[in-house]
Structure formats: structure tokens, C-alpha cells
Amino acid sequence: EIKESESRRPTVETGKIRIDEADNYLLYGDGAAIVNVSAYSIKQLYAQHNTNLLSRNLRYHIAGRDIDKAIADTINNDPDSFWLKNNGITIICDDFDIDGKEVRLRNFSIVNGGQTTYMLHKSPSINSDHDLYLPCKIIRIVGDTEDEKSSFSLSIAKATNSQKAIKPVDLKANSPEQVRFAQAM
């Protein structure tokens, strides 16, 4: 169960992330943006702030050998497909400003993508010379009162962490063999 009081835990006061190309972003209204964020810049933030970077993430890092192994395998052996295979991260913040290839964040936390963030941090192959990019939603917290801001923050954290896990039977049911069999019927 998610506790309401956890939605406004302390955040990282200020930080910067790098995006792939100058001014390459999609705005959603005036309160959100989607960018392609540098994995190395996320790794640097985690090195500086550790789990404080994930203070409002409801699940931090879920230790799962298979998923961690798959993320690490893509980073190390198929980095060009990382953007395609990874759901990315979601950041909530009091404010953000995009200027060229830099996004400045104020009072922010990664609320979804803790596992990805942790695996980027652990990866020795991600550095200033070897970087990759991943999708990132940046959402400005709305509300006039602390209660409204808390409620909004919690709603984003809940919604972005509520996906159902894929079971092996789900994968098998959609395998090419099963699809051909169903079409033949």
C-alpha cells in the first residue's frame, strides 16, 4: 500500500541533465516535457545524490536478477537499442528549464525508472566517452497548497508505477508460432 505521507518527501534541490540534441524536446502544455536524456547525466546525478534522487519513487530499485541482467545486457552488448527497449524515467519537479542541450531541474525526484537509474549507476561502460540516451518525462508539480502538490505528486508516482508485470505465459501466447496457429484455425 502506498502511503499518502510519502508523496512530498524531500527532493534534490537542483540538478542538470543533458539531452541528445539542442532544443530536442516535446512540450505538453506548459507543465511537462519529453526529452531524450543522457544516461551518463543520470548516472552522475545518482553518484552525487544516491537514493535521495529517488526519494519520491514508490519502489526505489526492485532487485530482480532477470530484469537487471536484461538491462545490463542491453547497456553492454546492444546500447543502440537501449532507447527502444527501455521505458525510460519520469521526473517530477517544482520547476524545469530547457536551454539548448541542458535541462535545469529544481526540487526534483525520479518517481519512475528507479531500476533503470540504478543499473545505469552500476554500469562501468557508461561514461563521458560512451553514453546512450533514454526517454524521460519531466512533469512540473501543480497545486496551490502543499496538500494539492502532495496529492498531485502521489498521483503521478502511483500512475507511473502501476503497470502489470508480463508473465511468461503472456509472452508464449503471442509468440509467432501461436499467432500462426490461431490464424490457421
Feature locations, PLM:
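Short, well-ordered loop/turn elements at secondary-structure boundaries
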Residues: 84-86, 103-106, 130-133
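Glycine- and acidic
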Residues: 96-106, 137, 151
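Short active-site loop/helix that positions an aromatic residue
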Residues: 105, 114-130
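Helix-hairpin-helix/helix-loop-helix acidic hairpins
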Residues: 81-97
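N-terminal extension/subdomain marker
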Residues: 1-81, 99
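Short helix/loop capping segments that flank catalytic or ligand/cofactor-binding pockets
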Residues: 99-101, 118-120, 146
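Long, internal scaffold/assembly segments composed of regular secondary structure
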Residues: 109-114, 140, 144
